Amino acid sequence: MVDKRESYTKEDLLASSRGELFGKEGPQLPAPNMLMMDRVVKMTDDGGNYNKGFVEAELDIHPDMWFFGCHFIGDPVMPGCLGLDAMWQLVGFYLGWLGGKGKGRALGVGEVKFTGQILPSAKKVTYRIHFRRVINRKLVMGMADGEVLCDGTVIYTASDLKVGLFKDTAAF
């Protein structure tokens, strides 16, 4: 039985990365350094822009985060692909929250737009995922739109995020 709470702490997210939150057959979040959130502040199966589910999560920004030291030397900025990956992570996490089983894999995105950046001076990144559709049959797949906010301002948007859960990834 899935522990379906509305919010999750950093410790809960780390438990997910070890396969402990949604069970051995459920999807896992990545471990640090690739875990791109500190907490999930809201999860609902009937909210969001399409009334099909909503997730909101946050990442606290610190100037000593690993990516600022290498992207770019003398011009530190969080790579945009990490924000995109965070949105995929949250789509997969939501599928596990719904009781989906399998290994999560990003399947694509329709369009991504970057209109801002995350610098070491930022305080908080917020991710919002609005589900368009969830298929929960032999194929388990989530389709959603997402946005990334830096200190309250929308800086990335993504449409048609897709994540699937697979029992066997050998042929993937």
From Swiss-Prot:
One of its GO terms (biological process) is unsaturated fatty acid biosynthetic process. InterPro entries: FabA, FabA_FabZ, HotDog_dom_sf. Its EC number is 4.2.1.59, 5.3.3.14. It catalyses: a (3R)-hydroxyacyl-[ACP] = a (2E)-enoyl-[ACP] + H2O; (3R)-hydroxydecanoyl-[ACP] = (2E)-decenoyl-[ACP] + H2O; (2E)-decenoyl-[ACP] = (3Z)-decenoyl-[ACP]. Transmembrane segments: none annotated. The keyword GTP-binding does not apply. Belongs to the thioester dehydratase family. FabA subfamily. Homodimer. This is 3-hydroxydecanoyl-[acyl-carrier-protein] dehydratase. The gene is fabA.
